[in-house]
Amino acid sequence: MKKYYSLICALLLAQGAMAIDYDQLKKSSKINVASKIELSKLQTQEEKTVVQSKATGSRLKALQKQMDNRTVRAIVRMTPGSDASTLAAEGITITSVVNHFAIATIRLSQLEKLAERNDVESISFGKRRKRLLLNKAHKSTGVDKIHLGTGLTQPYTGKGVAIGVIDDGFDPNHIMFQDAEGKSRFKMICQSEEENKPLTYLTTPAEIAAFQTDDQNESHATHVSGIAAGNCQNSTFQLQGVAPEADLLMGPIPYYDSDYEMFDKMVSWCRENGNKRLVLNMSYGANAGSHDTTDPEVAFMDEMIKKYDIVACIAAGNEADLDIVQRHTFTGGSDETMKAAFYSDLDGDDEMDVTEIYDYITVTQPEKQIEIDVVVFNTNTGTAKNTWKFVNSTHPDGREYPYSNTNFHGKVSVQSEDIGNGMKGYLLAITDISLLNSNCSLGYVIRGKEGQTVTSYLESTSVFDTEVPGCGNHITHDGTINSIACGTEPIIVGAYNTANSYKGADGNNYTFQDAFYGYKYGNKVGDITFFSSYGKLADGRELPHVCAPGLFIESSFNRYTDNYEEDVMKELTVGGNKYEFGQMSGTSMATPYMTGICALWLEADPTLNHTQIRDIAQQTAVLDAYCNTNNYYTKQNDGNQAGSGKVDAYAGLKYILDQKSSVLSPIADNKRFMIRSLSNNTFEAYTAGAVAMSAALYTMDGRLVSSASQSGNTIQVSAQGQHKGIYILRISDGKQSHVQKVVVK
């Protein structure tokens, strides 16, 4: 078929028809590797269409023109200082411009000319494989000290701030997101109705009320949104997220880079509705990427964050325990190789369940020619049954080819691109896998030159099979960090444990071992969670920045799926509607904690920029013994899995209010004062700007039972030894007094 199609294309090109020269396009250094993979798919689609049509003459030319007019939606990166909007003069439809980046709809026939422009640096339109990455957690992060506790003040709830959740599996009319009038607190629903097409937006209350869900198989987004900003206050059940009065906006996971146009819409909504600050939550990720700022998706996100001063929180990833990173520095040995095999049977049922494999390989000193062979290994002996040479002096930038033999049926492609820090990247894609013999494993053999460091980032749809002889060397877990999280502007969030069990709706208690059988590390309360990804990047940065609660977190479930029934913790029926709440674990759950905390901090001081918010999170984080203890996998000189430590919402808020009061910035009286209950019936009060404070605790009939005074803006008073009940706490800073009912337990 391909030979016949190639003859047709050659004829059409010779006649001046509009046939696309795909092979020439894939050689362009301006089209990134994921887009080259997409071009191959478009080429295959065209081959089938043309051959099956049996068209000739004018009918064939018309069909070819139709193929050429197919469109892709891309991020176009131009040289800094260029006006990206000028692309419209070429007949290209522009939907978003961020400095020298544009999101554009481009006809295939326009790609070659666009790539030839001197002011165009890169074009990215490939589909990227991405995966979805409360009670006890509130106390550990200090959120309860800000707005929870019987009879205590609730000054900060995220009011006046918008939270944009980019995810999958939304139920925006769940009781967790209803206001006092029963209306959804979601103000915008952005959805992808057709792959690689412009997104659609719902913004009216009627449209949002009529919306059910974007995905009947998933509950992830509903759970994440509940952690960040949910608020269920039913008479029989209460569960509150971190920022329960923040406005909510929802958007789909951007499988195509161009889907990031939704950020523009969210920013516009914020500006048109009180100039609110925007905090974004991205609890999804991918590992097969360059892990640097040259990644088109990462670079565009950085520019968007800087332009609009968005606070963006991104999950670190859940792969710290997986064998998905291999790294080796070659010493120049004559037979030195870097070998790896891929698992194809992940669930151990002796049946192949991996139909596509994506692996991104970075290489230092790219002026030295590297060699990459794709291999079918004998899983028992580690010997090569088939070897195909994909990168060498003959094919320095890779190639693609379909294979069909007694061991393997599928398509193999290796594409290259120049990336940051003087490195080159290769994307290995093995797709359409329809046969792999039971005693065979796909993999690679890499040969490098002395001094070259090669790092392989495998997408976790598979993992390295370290049991194949000779293929278990050079595995590291430093680098499991989410590739999408490698920008310079977001806050990257890892996970730690605030619980090691949960109670199901069936009344049974489920432990760590029930959920994660066989794991004997990272399972204690306080531990950095065993799966929390981390990594030291080529530019020296270490991620994540901070950690937040991520194990057995309770939140809302999507009513339109039953895929999470085993994780349900509570069922609630209101007005004939059944609502479910349950647990999930992951850095996906830790990230909305950080997102909600950012909303609280921005409510306290909306003038803080995104960099200051991140700095405060790191400066006030708790770096305890658990954070300083390497996890099971970390090795000497690895990045720090805990980052700067465990986020402390209360300490961060106090820091912000202290800074405001020190420069005489106005703080409303009802926002200056906070009180929290500590252990052993001790109460702590804080007043922004105070230089000295006094506290007195009275019984309800006015009898003084405890008092204290001290300099500074924080004071503690003890109720130890007092009977259980309600007491009156009076706090004074010499200028004003606060009277509050408190409960002694």
Q: Which sequence ranges carry the predicted segments?
A:
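Catalytic-core environment of secreted peptidases
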Residues: 193-206, 373-392, 405-407, 412, ...
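C-terminal subdomain of the subtilisin-like protease fold in secreted/lumenal serine endopeptidases
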Residues: 61-64, 277-281, 310, 314, ...
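Subtilisin-like serine protease catalytic core
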Residues: 20-21, 149-259, 274-277, 289, ...
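Autoinhibitory N-terminal propeptides
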Residues: 5, 18-154, 161-163, 175, ...
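Active-site core segment of subtilase-fold serine proteases
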Residues: 154-156, 169-222, 226, 378-462, ...
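Short acidic, glycine-rich surface-loop motifs adjacent to enzyme active sites
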Residues: 246, 267-292, 315-316, 445-450, ...
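Hydrolase catalytic cores
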Residues: 225-228, 249-255, 309, 358-380, ...
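C-terminal outer-membrane/trafficking sorting elements
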Residues: 666-745
